[in-house]
């Protein structure tokens, strides 16, 4: 890879590692210089907009967060959260989609932030409950996903996730325990690594899919293999619910 970068020629990579080159090519990381990528994006976007089989909403229930990661690009707004009026408007929108998309097969509700679980009971749960009940006993496949730091997950929320068709969460670790706790800490003397790992394991045991996204640097890469020890307590039958990215 370094050789191809230095030579500014991806064909150098093909000579060294054919499989890696083919993977980059198939995923469009490597694109022929004659391909109009802007036009391709426009075509994909048009196709998505016109697809009445699938509808996807992403909601930021708050721009506040319980961490202050140094690299975060979000502007945290303390105490910000969806108003009752906005929650009702979202529910109305979901109902309109259901009634105006006769070919609708899949409805995906994604939660982002800020930290989407921060005001879960008053913002997220009412919408989740409404959407689930709206699509229950219909031909539409409803499901929901979260991008979360994982700290606020507990068994009560997992029960809700199972009940309301939450089938996927993405949770980030900043490397191994020491590195992670230097970035994501609960207080001056308490890190978050152990609690988040335990929550990830709890999700897997309850058969909810989790992608563990690992942020890495030169320092975190040195200890990255130690992460496996923390997840060794998971039964083999539950490992299929974990993906490391």
Question: Where would I find each of the regions flagged by the language model?
Answer:
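Short, charge-rich binding segments
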Residues: 47-51, 62, 71, 137, ...
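Conserved, mostly hydrophobic/aromatic
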Residues: 65, 69, 111, 171
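N-terminal [4Fe-4S]-dependent radical SAM core
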Residues: 16-58, 102
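Radical SAM/AdoMet-radical enzyme domain recognition
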Residues: 91, 95-110, 119-245
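Canonical Radical SAM [4Fe-4S] cluster-binding loop centered on the CxxxCxxC motif
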Residues: 51-52, 56-87
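Active-site neighborhood of divalent metal-dependent phosphoester/pyrophosphate hydrolases
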Residues: 114
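Short amphipathic alpha-helical interface segments
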Residues: 1-22
């Amino acid at each position: 890879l370094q050789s191809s970068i230095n030579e500014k020629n991806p064909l150098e990579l093909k000579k060294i590692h054919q499989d890696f080159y083919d993977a980059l090519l198939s995923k469009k990381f490597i694109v022929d210089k004659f391909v109009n990528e802007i036009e391709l994006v426009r075509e994909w976007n048009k196709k998505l907009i016109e697809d009445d089989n699938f509808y996807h909403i992403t909601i930021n229930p708050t721009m506040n967060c319980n961490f202050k990661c140094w690299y975060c690009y979000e502007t945290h707004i303390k105490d910000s959260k969806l108003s009752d009026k906005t929650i009702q408007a979202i529910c109305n929108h979901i109902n309109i989609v259901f009634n105006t998309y006769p070919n609708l097969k899949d409805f995906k509700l994604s939660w982002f932030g800020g930290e989407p679980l921060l005001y879960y009971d008053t913002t997220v749960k009412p919408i989740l409950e409404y959407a689930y009940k709206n699509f229950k006993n219909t031909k539409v496949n409803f499901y929901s996903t979260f991008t979360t730091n994982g700290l606020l997950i507990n068994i009560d929320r997992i029960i809700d996730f199972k009940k309301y068709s939450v089938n996927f969460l993405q949770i980030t670790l900043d490397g191994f325990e020491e590195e992670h706790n230097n970035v994501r800490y609960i207080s001056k003397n308490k890190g978050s690594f152990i609690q988040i790992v335990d929550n990830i394991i709890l999700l897997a045991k309850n058969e909810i899919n989790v992608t563990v996204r690992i942020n890495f640097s030169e320092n975190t890469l040195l200890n990255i293999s130690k992460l496996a020890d923390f997840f060794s307590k998971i039964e083999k039958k539950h490992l299929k619910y974990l993906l490391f990215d």
